[in-house]
């Protein structure tokens, strides 16, 4: 600022004389006009010359303007006519200051100054390099000059930055315990006195303002991390409690849900995400948002994109059913055991519901109140139809029951009982029959073994053919001793069940083998096909793969899978020219073999797999097309099959069924899919 003092703009004595002449009987309006003219012609011109570069120049400006007002005030107080109108004249003076002062420049300098003040205040509350008393005097002069709004606006802005930085540094990743009350006490202690001076408020009013500021910042901080908070549930219950306490305003709740949906869409709801992972994420979302907002308004908004995404996933049904039978954090069996208090289709809008409450004000038009906190019910309601879920449930149950080796099906039975609360008895009748088959099989097996008609090691599961899903059956030549035992078992069954016949499914089941070699003994649980294959080496020391296929009466491709299994377990060794022999000692050199994925394939076929298997009759036509025409797209293959396969057994499949079949051929390494087209491998 220039060295020119405001009192010398016209001379202090001259100014007093002019005002004195005005005050003697002159009306108030005339005095105000004189003040405006004097301010405009004299003070304003010098204000335009002020160069506000630092806080010192700001102090000088406020000091001199304050002195200038004291001159006016003295003249007004000396006049009995004007003294009652002091407030009115002060308002006029303040308006002139706001109009002609460079407010934007003042705000810039003041912001920098306030930043220094808050830093020093946090460090030690006192600092010889920064005169806090001088800062408080500056605050008083800002209020006197009508610039308190500028001071408060800038102070709030800087205070928000500092409080936000402090809360972020200390609490950004502290999610296990709620930090809301601790943060309130901390910020009150740090800034309470300073805010009281700046705003001239009593202590209770200051605390209310600081609490509101902390709530706003903490709500924004937790909302920005809402996706990670949900992902870390239940280790983030403290952060959820913070959100429950601070995210109460409509704008805060809207920002919370919008941030969650945006982050969820970009990070979770992607094509590369596994459906099981998304389902478990949805469960965490339900838990978090119900704790945050029990009425369910926020959950309704946050869950819509997740539910829509899962509804479009073809494998979501299968993944959900699989998770219902898995324990621990990676499954939902614990949720399945939580029996809902009401049927999931019931409504809360009943006339006899004396606890009815209106929807929250920020609820969407299609908002429906949750009838309970049944997570499984919420997952089931994702899908428009329950029929695909029931079919997948039947497939999974059949697969699990077929894997049993001791008739103990209590876990599966309990799961089905829990599901009956949600689907009803009638819908799950097929599952009940499958469970009943296992129980009946146990009684029949005990009865047959009680009379020592068959080997103690042979146990059979008897299935009611019409009530089980389609099974993947492959017939092969059984070893003589095993066939004899099975025939004896079937005869005993026929005697007990009035001539009813058993049809064995030879590739289904398991066999416990003990293989004795020269330097070791192996105990393995294998499939009947693998057991039949290795039994071929009891009669010969070496065997050609073609001969093995002939003896088993199976395709070479299937026999190769059995062979890989025994090579992997170092029971057989390759001696060249597709010939193999038993590996009697570990010391023998052999090629390491990686077991392929076929060992984990289920014996139960889904509808898509059954359809693909039935389409093998068209494989020769597909081979002919790809041989003569090269790589072809799905649509062209479909059109050519429709055109060239004549009735009455014409091609009537859909493109979706053809796609499943071609995918199966790719899995069997007969086709390749590149550039959107299929070609022979």
From Swiss-Prot:
One of its GO terms (molecular function) is ubiquitin protein ligase binding. Keywords: Cell cycle, Cell division, Mitosis, Ubl conjugation pathway. InterPro entries: APC2-like (IPR044554), APC2_C (IPR014786), Cullin_homology (IPR016158), Cullin_homology_sf (IPR036317), Cullin_N (IPR001373), WH-like_DNA-bd_sf (IPR036388), WH_DNA-bd_sf (IPR036390). It holds the Pfam family Cullin. One of its GO terms (biological process) is protein K11-linked ubiquitination. One of its GO terms (cellular component) is nucleus. The APC/C is composed of at least 13 subunits: apc1, apc2, nuc2, apc4, apc5, cut9, apc8, apc10, apc11, hcn1, apc13, apc14 and apc15. Component of the anaphase-promoting complex/cyclosome (APC/C), a cell cycle-regulated E3 ubiquitin-protein ligase complex that controls progression through mitosis and the G1 phase of the cell cycle. The APC/C is thought to confer substrate specificity and, in the presence of ubiquitin-conjugating E2 enzymes, it catalyzes the formation of protein-ubiquitin conjugates that are subsequently degraded by the 26S proteasome. Belongs to the cullin family. This is Anaphase-promoting complex subunit 2. It comes from Schizosaccharomyces pombe (strain 972 / ATCC 24843).
């Amino acid at each position: 600022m220039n060295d020119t003092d405001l009192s010398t703009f016209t001379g202090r004595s001259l100014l007093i004389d002019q005002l004195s002449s005005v005050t003697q009987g002159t009306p108030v309006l005339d005095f105000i006009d004189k003040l405006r003219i004097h301010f405009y012609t004299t003070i304003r011109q010098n204000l335009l010359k002020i160069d506000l570069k630092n806080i010192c120049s700001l102090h000088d400006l406020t000091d001199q303007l304050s002195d200038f007002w004291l001159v006016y005030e003295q003249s007004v107080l000396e006049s009995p006519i004007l003294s009652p109108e002091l407030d009115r004249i002060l308002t006029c003076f303040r308006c002139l200051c706001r109009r002609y002062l460079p407010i934007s420049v003042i705000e810039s300098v003041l912001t920098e100054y306030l930043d220094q003040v808050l830093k020093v205040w946090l460090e030690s509350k006192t600092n010889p390099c920064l005169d806090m008393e001088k800062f408080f005097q500056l605050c008083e002069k800002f209020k006197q000059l009508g610039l308190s709004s500028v001071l408060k606006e800038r102070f709030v802005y800087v205070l928000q930055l500092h409080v936000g930085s402090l809360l972020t540094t200390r609490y950004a990743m502290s999610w296990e315990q709620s930090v809301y009350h601790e943060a309130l006490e901390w910020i009150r202690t740090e800034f309470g006195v300073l805010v009281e001076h700046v705003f001239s408020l009593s202590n209770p009013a200051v605390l209310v303002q600081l609490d509101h500021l902390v709530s706003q910042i903490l709500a924004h901080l937790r909302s920005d991390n809402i996706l990670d908070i949900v992902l870390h549930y239940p280790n983030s219950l403290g952060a959820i409690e913070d959100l429950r306490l601070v995210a109460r305003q409509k704008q805060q709740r809207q920002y919370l849900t919008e941030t969650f949906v945006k982050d969820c869409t970009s990070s979770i709801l992607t094509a590369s995400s596994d459906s099981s992972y998304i389902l478990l994420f949805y469960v965490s979302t339900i838990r978090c948002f119900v704790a945050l907002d029990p009425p369910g308004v926020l959950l309704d908004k946050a869950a819509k994109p997740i539910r829509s995404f899962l509804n479009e996933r073809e494998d979501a049904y299968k993944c959900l059913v699989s998770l219902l039978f898995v324990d621990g954090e990676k499954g939902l069996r614990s949720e399945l055991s939580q029996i809902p208090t009401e049927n999931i289709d019931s409504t809360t809008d009943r006339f006899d519901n004396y606890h009815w409450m209106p929807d929250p004000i920020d609820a969407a038009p299609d908002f429906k109140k949750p009838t309970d906190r049944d997570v499984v019910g919420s997952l089931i309601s994702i899908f428009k139809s329950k029929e695909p879920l029931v079919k997948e449930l039947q497939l999974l149950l059949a697969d699990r029951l077929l894997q049993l080796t001791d008739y103990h099906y209590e876990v599966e039975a309990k799961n089905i009982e829990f599901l009956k609360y949600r689907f009803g008895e009638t819908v799950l009748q097929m599952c009940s029959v499958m469970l009943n088959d296992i129980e009946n099989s146990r009684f029949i097996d005990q009865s047959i073994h009680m009379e020592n008609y068959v080997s103690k090691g042979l146990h059979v599961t008897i299935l009611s053919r019409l009530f089980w899903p389609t099974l993947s059956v492959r017939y092969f030549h059984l070893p003589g001793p095993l066939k004899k035992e099975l025939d004896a078992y079937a005869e005993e069954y026929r005697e007990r069940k009035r001539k009813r016949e058993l049809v064995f499914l030879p590739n289904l089941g398991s066999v416990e083998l003990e293989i004795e070699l020269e330097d070791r003994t192996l105990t393995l649980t294998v499939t009947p096909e693998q057991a039949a294959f290795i039994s071929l080496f009891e009669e010969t020391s070496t065997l050609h793969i073609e001969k093995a296929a002939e003896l088993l009466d199976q395709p070479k491709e299937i026999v190769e899978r059995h062979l890989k299994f025994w090579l992997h377990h170092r029971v057989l060794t390759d001696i060249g020219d597709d010939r193999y022999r038993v590996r009697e000692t570990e010391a023998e050199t052999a090629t390491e073999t990686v077991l392929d994925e076929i060992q984990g394939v289920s014996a139960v076929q889904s509808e898509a797999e059954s359809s693909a298997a039935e389409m093998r009759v068209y494989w020769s036509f597909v081979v002919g097309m790809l041989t003569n025409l090269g790589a072809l797209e799905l649509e062209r293959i479909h059109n050519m099959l429709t055109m060239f396969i004549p009735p009455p057994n014409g091609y009537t499949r859909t493109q979706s069924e053809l796609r499943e079949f071609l995918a199966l051929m790719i899995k069997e390494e007969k086709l390749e899919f590149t550039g959107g087209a299929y070609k022979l491998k």
